[in-house]
Swiss-Prot record:
Gene Ontology biological process terms, A to Z: central nervous system neuron development; memory; negative regulation of proteasomal ubiquitin-dependent protein catabolic process; negative regulation of protein polyubiquitination; tyrosine metabolic process; visual learning
Gene3D superfamilies, alphabetized: Tetratricopeptide repeat domain (1.25.40.10)
Placement of TPR repeats on the sequence: 51-84, 86-118, 123-156
Cross-referenced Pfam families: TPR_12 (PF13424)
Keyword Nucleotidyltransferase: no
Gene name, Swiss-Prot/TrEMBL: TTC36
Stored InterPro entries: TPR-like_helical_dom_sf (IPR011990), TPR_rpt (IPR019734), TTC36 (IPR038906)
Source organism of the structure: Homo sapiens (Human)
Domain of life: Eukaryota
Protein's name in the database: Tetratricopeptide repeat protein 36
Length: 189
């Protein structure tokens, strides 16, 4: 099956426009690990480990298509540590997949509030909230959330900001057309 990093590379190749960093077990580097440790150091270690295990079970259930089990596990993690943003962020993803956009937005608001708008959970919550806003045609709200996620280091959010910028999109299209013409010059008859 490959290492988590192999999976991340394949994810980036085959799905370049999906949020990166949501792959369970992916080694995001020392900075991300430090960020996560700082977010979690306020919680009792035993409860934190149990909460993370429940979240992992929830993510695995969601990936297997068992959204009811995923929601149950995320709910258990929230009951265990109701002040930890990560479980709300994960539950929001499962709720969105289930079609409960209002519930997903509610969880994302709570995750942003608990994280203080900082760290990995906030970054992921801003990206998710931005995607939901974009799907609902609320581009200004989407842009604000993507800007916040980009400031927190999300490359996906940066790409979304470019896509939301009509001038950048036009420039990218013109550049692509020019490069295509340079690669395939017309017959000079």
């Amino acid at each position: 099956m490959g290492t988590p990093n192999d999976q991340a590379v394949l994810q980036a190749i085959f799905n370049p426009d999906t949020p990166f960093g949501d792959i369970v077990g992916l080694d995001l580097g020392e900075e991300a690990e430090k960020e996560e440790r700082e977010e979690d150091e306020v919680f009792p270690q035993a409860q934190l480990e149990q909460s993370k295990a429940l979240e992992l079970q929830g993510v695995m259930a969601a990936e297997a298509g068992d959204l009811s089990t995923a929601l149950e596990r995320f709910g258990q993690a929230i009951c265990l540590l109701p002040e930890r943003a990560s479980a709300y962020n994960n539950r929001a993803q499962a709720r969105r997949l289930q079609g409960d956009v209002a519930g997903a937005l509610e969880d994302l608001e709570r995750a942003v509030e608990l994280s203080g708008g900082r760290g990995r959970a906030a970054r992921q919550s801003f990206v998710q909230r931005g995607l939901l806003a974009r799907l609902q045609g609320r581009d200004d709200d989407a842009r604000r959330d993507f800007e916040r996620a980009a400031r927190l280091g999300s490359p996906f959010a940066r790409r979304q900001l470019v896509l939301l910028n009509p001038y950048a999109a036009l420039c990218n299209r013109m550049l692509a057309d020019m490069m295509g013409q340079l690669r395939r010059p017309r017959d000079s008859r």
